[in-house]
């Protein structure tokens, strides 16, 4: 008997909603990345986009452990000489909490065409409301580790 290889048409996708309230950012990102890639399914294959949709709510209430709120910086460059900009994690969390959570999760996905397709299934919202109620998302509980 030959080994089963999943095809793109064989995939059934479910919607998961994760509440990010008081969940450490890195632990949230690991769980969401595994759901997006489909690593929780027995039919996982690294070359097939077999993951589920993930909706994250309350991104503004995510926990940042340690001194990372003031001590860790995110950088980007304009492309011009002297154009390096930096912001602390706390500044980004106050201004765009959904981007901070999205950047943490997308950084754990493959850096290729498949990774870009997988990241389109991630939806992050700063508040408790989301427009995906029609998809009937299943709540996903993250087991909390003592901080």
From Swiss-Prot:
Matching InterPro entries: Ribosomal_uL13 (IPR005822), Ribosomal_uL13_bac-type (IPR005823), Ribosomal_uL13_CS (IPR023563), Ribosomal_uL13_sf (IPR036899)
One MF term in the entry's GO annotations: mRNA binding
Ribonucleoprotein is among the record's keywords: yes
Keywords on record: Ribonucleoprotein, Ribosomal protein
Entry function: This protein is one of the early assembly proteins of the 50S ribosomal subunit, although it is not seen to bind rRNA by itself. It is important during the early stages of 50S assembly.
Protein name: Large ribosomal subunit protein uL13
Lineage: Bacteria, Bacillati, Actinomycetota, Actinomycetes, Mycobacteriales
Lineage top rank: taxon: Bacteria
UniProt source species: Rhodococcus jostii (strain RHA1)
Biological process annotations from GO: negative regulation of translation; translation
Subunit structure: Part of the 50S ribosomal subunit.
Family that this chain belongs to: Belongs to the universal ribosomal protein uL13 family.
């Amino acid at each position: 008997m030959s080994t089963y290889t999943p095809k793109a048409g064989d995939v059934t996708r479910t919607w998961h909603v994760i509440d990010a309230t008081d969940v450490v950012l890195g632990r949230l990102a690991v769980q969401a990345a595994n759901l997006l890639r489909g690593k929780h399914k027995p039919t996982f294959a690294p070359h097939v986009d077999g993951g589920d949709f993930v909706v994250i709510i309350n991104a503004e209430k995510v926990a940042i452990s340690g001194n990372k709120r003031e001590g860790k910086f995110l950088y980007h460059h304009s492309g011009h000489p002297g154009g390096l900009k930096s912001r602390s994690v706390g500044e980004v969390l106050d201004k765009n909490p959904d981007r901070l959570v999205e950047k943490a999760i997308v950084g754990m996905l493959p850096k290729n065409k498949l990774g870009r397709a997988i990241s389109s299934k991630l939806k992050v919202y700063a508040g408790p409301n989301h427009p995906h109620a029609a998809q009937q998302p299943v709540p996903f509980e993250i087991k909390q580790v003592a901080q």
